[in-house]
From Swiss-Prot:
Belongs to the D-alanine--D-alanine ligase family. Mg(2+) 2 binds at E270, N272. This is D-alanine--D-alanine ligase. It catalyses: 2 D-alanine + ATP = D-alanyl-D-alanine + ADP + phosphate + H(+). The lineage of its organism: Bacteria, Pseudomonadati, Pseudomonadota, Gammaproteobacteria, Alteromonadales. Residues 107-303 form the ATP-grasp domain. It comes from Pseudoalteromonas translucida (strain TAC 125).
Length: 306
């Protein structure tokens, strides 16, 4: 029988929620819950879709592990509620969460700070747009709803018609959409844990890009950890990731995604403040390459609330 670990008190794992990433969050949260309980921590699952947050007080919760992805859980909303309730929680604060979740604001920040990021434009559902002019400027683009994760609502476009179709779909998720120059090359992700940067992971997929299907369903997606990069490139990419993480005000733990074009230049994509923690997730993979088990990773994240 596992000895009870009392230093954390009673912990609620927030999972599920109302976002388009609910199913992924349920899997992440269950994995986190199992790890905490295996470590002897008094932890329970709490789904904000099923019950109001104020019940956390009734349950005498001491701290919260946030495993919510997307809107309502990763955008500063639940963080603000927990701040109001004086409950310590994992990950970034209200501002860091809100900024990182907003792809458009992140791009503006990266650009203004001189960090390398792909050329882009922003399309608003309430305003008109010229698909032909955008495609003439960029040739090939990636379309991303500003506030979604797990590649939800994302699509490539190489013609004005494809762009119109991609925007029409993206507008179902968000009124502001990021249209980004397509970078053809290698895709990487870098985990930040406390003040450490973990080994870089490279993802390869026949899907064209690392989309929802490649992330959670495909058996053809391959992961290389640590990535096959020179020591200089690895150091540069890790430093760039840490700069981006700090710039948006993220803290505690998270993941930064980046690309390398065929000329060897690196470009920042986005910062994730509550990355996936499923069996296929990248943060546990990086932690394992760093010598930490999944349980050790989860406990280390929770320790940041003490």
């Amino acid at each position: 029988m596992t000895q009870l670990n009392t230093q954390f008190g009673k912990v609620a794992v927030l999972l599920g929620g109302n976002s388009a990433e609910r199913e992924v969050s349920l899997r992440s949260g269950q994995a986190v819950l199992n790890a905490l309980q295996n470590h002897g921590i008094n932890a329970i699952a709490f789904d904000p879709k099923e019950r109001p947050l104020w019940e956390l007080n009734e349950l005498a919760i001491d701290r919260v592990f946030i495993a919510l992805h997307g809107r309502g859980g990763e955008d500063g909303t639940v963080q603000g509620a927990l701040e109001f309730m004086n409950l310590p929680y994992t990950g970034s604060n209200v501002l860091g969460s809100a900024l990182a979740m907003d792809k458009v604001r992140c791009k503006h920040l990266f650009k203004s700070a001189g960090l390398s990021t792909a050329p882009y434009t922003v399309v608003d559902a309430k305003k008109g747009f010229d698909a032909a002019a955008i495609m003439q400027q960029f040739k090939k683009v990636m379309v991303k709803p500003s506030h979604e994760g797990s590649s939800i609502g994302m699509a490539q476009a190489s013609t004005p018609q494809e762009l119109e179709d991609a925007l029409s779909n993206a507008f179902k998720f968000d009124s502001q959409v990021l249209v980004e120059q397509w970078i053809s090359g290698r895709e990487f992700t870098i985990t930040v844990l406390g003040d450490e940067v973990l080994p870089v992971i490279e993802m390869t997929t026949p899907n064209g890009f690392y989309d929802y299907q490649a992330k959670y369903q495909a058996t053809t997606t391959q992961y290389h950890c640590p990535a096959d990069l020179s020591p200089a490139d690895t150091e540069h990419l890790q430093a760039m990731a840490l700069d981006a993480f700090d710039l948006v005000g993220a803290s505690g733990w998270g993941r930064v995604d980046a690309m390398q074009d065929q000329q060897g230049n690196f470009y920042l994509l986005e910062v994730n403040t509550v990355p996936g923690m499923t069996e296929k997730s990248l943060v546990p993979m990086a932690a394992k390459a760093h010598g930490a088990s999944f349980e050790q990773l989860v406990v280390r994240i929770l320790e940041q609330t003490l």
